[in-house]
Amino acid sequence: MDINPKFVYQSPVHFDELDPMQMLHNSRFPAHVERAISAFYTSSGRKWEPRVDDNPDQFHVVRDLHIEYLNPLIGPGSMRVDVWVERIGTTSCVYGFLCSSADGNIPYARGERTIVKIDPASYRPSPWSDFFRARHADLLKDLPAYA
């Protein structure tokens, strides 16, 4: 039984994301993970702002992305994306994720995505806001990985 905190997002898979074998192309999984993390931000009361000053935590870069492909996703439909926080540092945040069938029974891919908040003036690492840290603490994993 999975009792770790996580954010669950149902991500639509469209026919134009499929390869010639009707499988979700490997390059599309990161986009679905990004959509899930964006939905988590929105559910937290934050949104992407035209002015960085209105939401400084949105000014971050992806430092690392690791994906392990487990099973093919065949055809269009819905894919479940579970997102949790593996670690949060002063300037970095490591998300864990699991992409699976809509019912969560078939795992397709799992991995980690690391982001680093940067200062918009210097492009150097910059600390997360208290709001970001508090909201992400809700998803902090404290037990072994899901899959």
Q: Which residues make up each language-model segment?
A:
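Residue-level preference for alpha-helix termini and adjacent loops
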Residues: H14-M23, F59-V61, P72, K117, ...
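Short aromatic/hydrophobic contact patches that present stacked aromatics
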Residues: P12, H66, T114
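Hydrophobic pocket/interface hotspot
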Residues: Q22, V83, Y123
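HotDog/MaoC-like acyl-thioester-processing domains
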Residues: I3-Y9, P72-S78, E86-A147
